Amino acid sequence: MRWQCGTRFRGLRPAVAPWTALLALGLPGWVLAVSATAAAVVPEQHASVAGQHPLDWLLTDRGPFHRAQEYADFMERYRQGFTTRYRIYREFARWKVNNLALERKDFFSLPLPLAPEFIRNIRLLGRRPNLQQVTENLIKKYGTHFLLSATLGGEESLTIFVDKQKLGRKTETTGGASIIGGSGNSTAVSLETLHQLAASYFIDRESTLRRLHHIQIATGAIKVTETRTGPLGCSNYDNLDSVSSVLVQSPENKVQLLGLQVLLPEYLRERFVAAALSYITCSSEGELVCKENDCWCKCSPTFPECNCPDADIQAMEDSLLQIQDSWATHNRQFEESEEFQALLKRLPDDRFLNSTAISQFWAMDTSLQHRYQQLGAGLKVLFKKTHRILRRLFNLCKRCHRQPRFRLPKERSLSYWWNRIQSLLYCGESTFPGTFLEQSHSCTCPYDQSSCQGPIPCALGEGPACAHCAPDNSTRCGSCNPGYVLAQGLCRPEVAESLENFLGLETDLQDLELKYLLQKQDSRIEVHSIFISNDMRLGSWFDPSWRKRMLLTLKSNKYKPGLVHVMLALSLQICLTKNSTLEPVMAIYVNPFGGSHSESWFMPVNEGSFPDWERTNVDAAAQCQNWTITLGNRWKTFFETVHVYLRSRIKSLDDSSNETIYYEPLEMTDPSKNLGYMKINTLQVFGYSLPFDPDAIRDLILQLDYPYTQGSQDSALLQLIELRDRVNQLSPPGKVRLDLFSCLLRHRLKLANNEVGRIQSSLRAFNSKLPNPVEYETGKLCS
């Protein structure tokens, strides 16, 4: 007699000592008759849902029915990926069968009618048999349980195993016939179609089976099994073992079994339970041992690997491999999806797309986002299933010599898909696309492909990157960003053209040369200028007390407007009468490019690191001295007019401290009390003159509004910025540079204030776009 995995029994507790319960037994049975019919359709979902694992006990534990044919069929289908079962069946008249012998014993206290051979085998065991003897003499002959009650009858059923992932795909039918009804060459099989076919099974069995087998062959999404078991007519059977199955399972009436140990003497019961559990759990290959909530088989020398169910382990490893294939299939289907392919077609091909650019297109595609979420949900289900199988697999293998090895599948990140898009765009010139490397802008091709790299457009960006790719060849750079110029296909920093046509600035003297020439007061470095003063004349003695301050002016550009001048030193030859106590004091103001006297800056003599006056005697009498202030290359500056304010002070010797003190002279009303006279023989400026073309600079400024050619405006701006910086470099010392360039535009080019402001704004805006822009604050000098 055979029974199915859904039967319940009594008399069995968890497999821990003391042994009080067993699992499965069949005995020769009874005669029965069947009639009447009943039909039902039962869908069963075998895929585990969240938080429920209805099949874990079947897959992990070797329960009492693991050898039942229905359980074996279920396991085979489950491992093949069929997650849902639809079953339509009908049963024939159920007959309730009870064990009258056991009832007579309980009611009438009569001895059980045990077979003489069974009694003889019990006696042969003796008082203390080992587990092997119990197994050989009792369990292998009579089983572990006997039947208390059951419902007998016949049954015929149709079972459809369904793989829902494959079911919805369109399937091309063969021979031009439709799967359902022959209405076309292509159809999609739905669950509703299967429901209709299953419902028509008992009405038109042959036609239904033919259509179902057609779907099974065409799609591979279903597996059809037809079973007809038990006595299907009103026939009598002398031996129920000749029938494949006559036990009918129903929710209201299950098969009831009782452990065989209740028929045995007290001294054999515990030993029988231990032997039965070892026989069932360890398949007679060892002895079941339970300790600290854990049970295992103590293997016999003949079967050292009894704790390793090879078939189950192999089945789980096969399931893991199938999950790996399903994982790869999910990713491949996502890559082949309409949403993913639509994004590829929508991407621009006139410029290179880095990962950041692709991520922006990805984020704006809502349909692709939804499809990507579907991919993540499907992979999450597979990941949970993988974890469940791995837990069961490691539980089964924890006492095996060989431990399983498996690499968990990993979900592909967004950065992987962005790189995959780059690979499809730029490395798809072969059958199988390669892998794009963004850092090197190259492709790694498959080993069997000599070349897979296609044309890679130029990269756009800021700074040295391209502004636009060439329209005739996107792999080449067509134009560059402001501040860069295209040279040999690359954007290189743009350098301003020479300023010699506008203002010559390349005549600097070396410090040693300059020092030597200034000491000699070489006429070659003297800047010709005109002396102007209303207070005195050169070479004439005057009374310095006549006025507190005298103005001496040197004007350089009165007749030569095509030059600008750079001052390197200023020298005065001052003579005093003998025994004079007067000391000259000079305040120097420099006007760089003309304008009013208020547009001059004060020279900070002997302040900070600025140089002081140097005095050298001209004659032995020491009546005349050369007063020289040397600016050198460090402090040189532009000048057009030099204003010298001359004052006098009285030099006296302090007897108490032996120090020289100075004080301002009082106004003398009596000429006879004169303190001495002063004479200035020479007032010279040493430096050099630079060629200056105001018309050329005006033309350069005009290009800001009316550029001659493409790029000439940028070139003009770059030259003006260079000119501005070179001019402002000669600004006098101070916390803030003076804006000498505005003075140059205002007074030498005669531009209006609004024009000067507009030019300065244009230069600042263009300079901010240049690579590594240098901005500095300037102070206003000219109005």
Swiss-Prot record:
Pfam families: BRINP, EGF_BRNP1-3, MACPF. One of its GO terms (biological process) is negative regulation of mitotic cell cycle. It is found in: Secreted. Its main location: secreted. It comes from the Eukaryota. InterPro entries: BRINP, MACPF. One of its GO terms (cellular component) is cytoplasm. Residues 1-33 form the signal peptide. Keywords: Cell cycle, Glycoprotein, Growth arrest, Secreted, Signal. The keyword Cell wall biogenesis/degradation does not apply. Glycans are attached at residues 185, 354, 473, 579, 626, 658. Transmembrane segments: none annotated. Residues 85-281 form the MACPF domain. Inhibits neuronal cell proliferation by negative regulation of the cell cycle transition. Belongs to the BRINP family. This is BMP/retinoic acid-inducible neural-specific protein 2. The gene is BRINP2.
